[in-house]
Amino acid sequence: MSLFPSLTLLLLSVVATSYSETVTCEDSQKICPAVIACNSPGINGFPGKDGRDGTKGEKGEPGQGLRGLQGPPGKLGPPGNPGSSGSPGPKGQKGDPGESPDGDSSLAASERKALQTEMARIKKWLTFSLGRQVGNKFFLTNGEMMSFDKVKALCAKFQASVATPRNAAENRAIQNLIKEEAFLGITDENTEGEFVDLTGNKLTYTNWNNGEPNNAGSNEDCVLLLKNGKWNDIPCSSSHLALCEFPI
């Protein structure tokens, strides 16, 4: 057997192998399409890293699907600030008079009667022991001696006023009550020689002693009821019996 054909085939194989390392598969097909074949593809490499996120796209149109059910209500929010008060409503109609049991009504009447009886008894006791009543006035003394200003304060404390006789009957009642000379609610402190009561009204009744008022010492601005029932002007700072009158 001849070795030439075998040697020729071996040389062609070597040349094809060395040439395929520098020539691309495409070029090799052009050069030697009938003799040299391309190698098979290699194994795929590892995936590359993800690229950066792109810019946000525009909002798309609503889908064509059915609208979902309404979700549950959210939590209650904090209470708001209190509102301003509204305007007052119209006045309601007068109600019907109430009804009280007959027993309560009769009890109240009996209690009032008992209270009135007790007050009358106390008034009689005061009149007998400490005071005198004339008409709708009740004259009362505590037996203490003090200045005119203190007498005014004492009477005002008991919602009374300094005794001021308006007629002879009241003057006589005071005279019979006192055992000492007492202040009257009369003065000329505002205008010398013009005696008025403590409300500023001019006197409609007087009972001055002979030669009075004389303003001795130029400081006699108050009036004293003497034991004989006559009046005398004296200094307001002197101390005399406190005498008050109470309206009844």
UniProtKB/Swiss-Prot annotation:
Disulphide bond pairs: C155-C244, C222-C236
GO MF annotations, alphabetized: D-mannose binding
Coarse class of the protein's main subcellular location: secreted
InterPro entries: C-type_lectin-like, C-type_lectin-like/link_sf, C-type_lectin_CS, Ca-dependent_lectin, Collagen, Collectin_CTLD, CTDL_fold
Modification after translation (UniProt): Hydroxylation on proline residues within the sequence motif, GXPG, is most likely to be 4-hydroxy as this fits the requirement for 4-hydroxylation in vertebrates.
4-hydroxyproline PTM sites in chain numbering: P47, P73, P79, P82, P88
Residue stretches of biased makeup (Basic and acidic residues): 49-61
Domain Collagen-like stretches: 42-99
A biological process term (GO) from this entry: complement activation, classical pathway
Keyword entries, A-Z: Calcium, Coiled coil, Collagen, Complement activation lectin pathway, Complement pathway, Disulfide bond, Hydroxylation, Immunity, Innate immunity, Lectin, Mannose-binding, Repeat, Secreted, Signal
Residue segments, region Disordered: 43-113
Coiled coil regions, renumbered to chain: 112-130
Keyword Coiled coil attributed: yes
Signal peptide per UniProt: 1-20
Subcellular location per the Swiss-Prot or TrEMBL entry: Secreted
Ranges annotated as biased composition (Low complexity): 82-91
Entry GO CC: collagen trimer; extracellular space; multivesicular body
Domain C-type lectin: 134-245
Pfam families with a match to the protein in the record: Collagen (PF01391), Lectin_C (PF00059)
Function of the molecule: Calcium-dependent lectin involved in innate immune defense. Binds mannose, fucose and N-acetylglucosamine on different microorganisms and activates the lectin complement pathway. Binds to late apoptotic cells, as well as to apoptotic blebs and to necrotic cells, but not to early apoptotic cells, facilitating their uptake by macrophages.
Complex and partners: Oligomeric complex of 3 or more homotrimers. Interacts with MASP1 and MASP2. Interacts with MEP1A and MEP1B and may inhibit their catalytic activity.
Domain notes from UniProt: The coiled-coil domain mediates trimerization.
PANTHER family in UniProt: MANNOSE-BINDING PROTEIN C, PULMONARY SURFACTANT-ASSOCIATED PROTEIN A
Name the record gives this protein: Mannose-binding protein C
Annotated source species: Chlorocebus aethiops
Lineage of producing organism: Eukaryota, Metazoa, Chordata, Craniata, Vertebrata
